[in-house]
C-alpha cells in the first residue's frame, strides 16, 4: 500500500500514477476481470486518487491524502489539486487498514460541487456506487448507471472493504499554494487557469493511455458490430439464379471487337429465344432494387438497394437473369433482387 500521510503535490502526483497503474494493468494478481475498464476513466468528468488509513475501536475514523483532477472542455485533464479525505463511522470494528482509492466523478456537478465549495461530501446528493470491473466495453455499465460517483478500493488489513458514505474530500490549500507558488483555489486549478505541471507528466501519460485504449476498443467493437450486421444482411439476400443468360445486348456490341474480347465473353453465348425484348414498348418497364448487387463477371449490372432500373429484356420468371439499364450502363442482373414498379 502507498503512504497515506499528506505530502507535497509532486509526490502525490507520482503516487497517483502508481495507484492508477495498479488498478488498471493486468498482472498475476489482477486478471482481466479485476481492473478498472478503460472506458470508465476515459469518460469520467473528474478523478480523485488517494491513499487512506482507517482505524477502528467502537468508532472508526479514516483520513488520507491524494489529488483530484477535472476533465476540461477540450477533453484534456486539468492540473492536479491536492486533497485530503476524512470521515467517521459507527459500529464495532477493531483494527487498522491502509487502502488505495480511485474515485470516479461521472458528472460535471460532482466536480463543480468540490471545486466551488472546496469540500465534497460523498453520499447525500451525490450517489456513490462500487465501480464496474473488467475490460468488456460492450457491457458498458457506466453509461447505464445513474451513480454520480464510482469508487474502487484495494486494501490490506482486517477490514474486508471500505465505505465512503459520509466521507469528505477536503481541499489542501497550503499544499497547492506551495506547489503553484501562489494563493490559488481548487476551482482555478481544476477549470483550466493553471497549465499542466511537468512534474505530473507521468500521471498524464497514464491518463491519456485510457483514452487511446477506449478508442481502440471502440473501433474493435464497431468493426465486430459492422461484421455482424453485414453477415445478417448477407443471410437475408435471396440466392442468385443458378444459370446465367447466354448473352446481353451490351456484350453483343463487344462481339465485333478483337478475338480476345470475343473469347472474354464466351461465357455468355447468345440469348435464348424465350427472352422477351421490352425496349420498344411504349411504356418502358422499370423495377426497383430490393437489395444491392455487386457484379462478379463482365456484363453484370451493379446497383444499390433503391435504384430504379429500366428493363431491356426479361423472362417470365423472377428466378432468372434479366437485362437492364442504369445510369447509362447496360448489363444483366438477378431478377429476384428487384420488384416491379
UniProtKB/Swiss-Prot annotation:
Residues 282-341 form the SH3 domain. GO terms for molecular function: phosphatidylinositol binding. GO terms for cellular component: ruffle membrane. GO terms for biological process: regulation of ruffle assembly. CDD domains: SH3_SH3YL1_like, SYLF_SH3YL1_like. Residues 246-264 have a biased composition (Polar residues). It comes from the Eukaryota. Residues 221-265 are annotated as: Disordered. PROSITE patterns: SH3 (PS50002). Pfam families: SH3_9, Ysc84. Keywords: SH3 domain. Belongs to the SH3YL1 family. Interacts with SH3D19. This is SH3 domain-containing YSC84-like protein 1.
